Amino acid sequence: FSTIQNERERLIRAYRKTIRFTAFITLPIMAGLFVTAGPVIRLLLKEEWWPSIPFFQLLCLGGCFTILTAINNNFIKVSGRSDGILKIEYYKIAFTVAVVLLTYREDVLTMVAGLVVTRLLVYIINMIYTAHYTGYRFSMQLMDLLPYAGLSILMTLLLLPIGGWIENQLLLLVTQAAAGTVIYIGTAYITGSKILKDSLELIRKKNCLLYTSPSPRDG
């Protein structure tokens, strides 16, 4: 019994680290895409496509939940309960149908917003199933996500006003991308993010291996 318990705790630690690392990378990228959607689309597409900016922003929000749901699905598969994933898909279909029925008379943006809410609801249900099958509790996963969600929201709030100060779209894109990187990484460093420290340590070790590895001539 103790061996099984130790294995379960080891898996939960691995799950937590995976979720934290995924959130650390994914959430700021999606937030950055949300913020820079305007300059990116205006630079790459013709003016008739500019109204698609809010759609792209909503898809970025929904993408956060989709990625995290996929990670949790892998945890459920590891636990040997793939039937749980099928149950979650039933919820997803039901929510999607409900959103379409409730919003089909509204504009397309409202329908897309409803589908983003669907992804959020599916992710919440997914967290509950993950907790049931793996022991990775709902509250535990929420606490693993909140620091990086908070940093991403802070970054977004600080970057959005820049759009009203710079008219040149290329300069705006570069400024927002650079400022966002500095704000996110800087704040994570100041607050002592363990994932950031682990990532920097991994990069340092890889660089050490790269510079210390023998060349073919030395062989």
Name these PLM-found stretches:
Residues 36-38, 45-49, 103-105, 163, ...:
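Short helix-capping/hinge motifs at transmembrane helix termini and TM-loop junctions
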Residues 54-100, 104, 108-132, 176-181:
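Short runs within selected transmembrane alpha-helices of multi-pass transporters and secretion channels
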Residues 1-89:
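Specific pore-lining/lateral-gate transmembrane helices of multi-pass inner-membrane transport
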Residues 54-55, 111, 144, 148, ...:
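Residue-level signature of transmembrane alpha-helical entry/exit and packing/kink sites
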Residues 91-94, 147-159:
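Hydrophobic membrane-spanning alpha-helices of multi-pass integral membrane proteins
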Residues 214-219:
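A short, hydrophobic C-terminal helix/tail in secreted or cell-surface proteins
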Residues 131, 136-138, 145, 157-213:
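Membrane-proximal transmembrane or re-entrant/amphipathic helices at the cytosolic face
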Residues 30-35, 43, 97, 101, ...:
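Membrane-embedded alpha-helical segments of multi-pass transporters/permeases
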